[in-house]
Amino acid sequence: MIIVPDASVILKWVLEKASESDQVQARWLQESILADQVEIRLPTLWRFEVGNVLGLKQPKLAKELFSVLLAYDFEEVPLGNDYAQEVLEHMREVNGVTFYDAAYHVLALRMKGLYLTADLAYVKKAKRKGHVALLAEWECGSQRVL
């Protein structure tokens, strides 16, 4: 199973908040990665999104936390012309979404995988495109997609 988690999911592994309802799913995904039960693909822009949040929210720990995430050595997909054009087309079709979110979703569509996000607003806008799930509603390990 190919999963494309966005920054909102990845950050849960290092900025843990027990009060968040989707923490169980985030932890399950992390454990599944370590056990080689799922394959992760990410657009290269994930580094910028995650680095930005860590630098702003945890400036004293940002370098250490970012190193932990980089150690996963995720397979990254560069944003070439064809990919970028698909992202822009996706934005046109799904009004009001960001290039960042669309890049993750388009990658999941291209890989026939699942875009996993904690962003309810995005899922509501884009679920008709398929291959997207809200982390809090994700049935860990199943192929259920919205």
Please place each PLM-identified region on the residue numbering:
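A short glycine/serine-rich beta->alpha loop
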Residues: 36-39, 92-96
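Acidic catalytic patch
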Residues: 70-94
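Glycine-rich phosphate-binding loop at the start of an alpha helix
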Residues: 44, 81, 101-102
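Short, well-structured N-terminal submotif of metal-dependent ribonuclease cores
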Residues: 1-42, 55-64, 129, 140-145
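Acidic active-site catalytic centers that drive phospho-/nucleotidyl reactions
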Residues: 6, 101, 119
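Helix-adjacent hinge/juxtasegments
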Residues: 59-65, 72-77
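Acidic, PIN/NYN-like endoribonuclease modules and their adjacent C-terminal/linker elements
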Residues: 2, 42, 47, 76, ...
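A general alpha-helix detector
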Residues: 9-10, 49-53, 69, 86, ...
